[in-house]
Amino acid sequence: SPKVFGPQGPKIDETKILSGHPAEMKLAEFDPAILEPGKYILFTQDVTAAIGPWGASFAANLTPDNETGIGTWQPEMFINALRTGKHLGAGRPILPPMPWEMVGKLTDEDLKAVFAYLKSIPPIKNKVPDPKPLDQLLSSK
């Protein structure tokens, strides 16, 4: 979830809870040498984006917004995505740092409960950027 920063550090921005990486937040400059496998993974200041040897990945909008979130998803789509590690169960890979391998081990009943909770929170319109492969990130530097 996006964060707000105060005197005691970052706190979840409750007006944007579970809405993913803020569309307007740009990635900071970085030294590509630190992305070699076995070195570092970089995170944005609010931990909604990660940069590593795979490229850049962004926290998804998990709110029930029909256009930018999971509003049109069905429980089976959610479960299949977390079991296969594929977006919508058949698309692009779900990238780090999302621990889909661990979450996907939950029972169907537990995953349906998580999905029901996500569908119950307020929808927030936030178009999260698409993942960027490492070569695309490096060519834009």
Label the predicted regions.
Residues 70-82:
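Aromatic- and charge-enriched surface segment that lines or borders ligand/interaction sites
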Residues 65, 84-88:
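Short hydrophobic alpha-helical module
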Residues 1-57, 75-76, 87-141:
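Flexible coil segments in periplasmic/lumen-exposed cytochrome c-class electron-transfer proteins
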